[in-house]
């Protein structure tokens, strides 16, 4: 049995259409059950939300389409937590996407193979095939003590570890002196992100999920090439019209799933992730992207 796909959508009809079109091109799409959780409208977003719901009501080519239209706006975090929890009450595994993601034709094959191969491997609790552009060679698949929320999968056996109380997780991370490791060895301020969630400066489900698994020494299976691209940084609605802090190249070749032994973290992958995040969010790189986008806007004005 194939893993059900769970898609979270809100107010971006064109992103939603692109996500579904790319997903539909996968050879396993017609054999897969799709759950769509459509969040309710905030004031002023009614028209866009209605447009999204018209898109998902079209005749898509999946085995079965289950649509949950929220009557109120839950917000992404609450929608993801409730949606994943409900699907895992009747299935033992799940593949999760958000509306700004587009996937390779080999995405579903890879995710289903990994979810089957590692279904009884307790140390592995999270799966992704998204990878940022990076320097340095990585194997096709590897294990790392981290999480990636852009096109991921998990099992009901792992989701039971989810701790929604970020304060409890932060307290334990600090008590054990693990802030540096939690920050990907200084690569990104994930500890501060967790603090911000606690103080309601963000409402991230991801940071709480990452903390939940990190504190239990659980691993993610990741890939050296990306079968997922995040199209949500387009700004104006045209993906190629802006420079991005984080870039990824969508691979159009399959990734073989070979069981990794021994089951332990790949330290090279950890180093590459840390270095990539440190560079992408450095002031130097941010300035470069800012200037690049400024020039793009000036050039576009001149063309008009």
Language-model features: where?
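An acidic/histidine-cluster motif and surrounding catalytic segment
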Residues: 1-96, 101-304
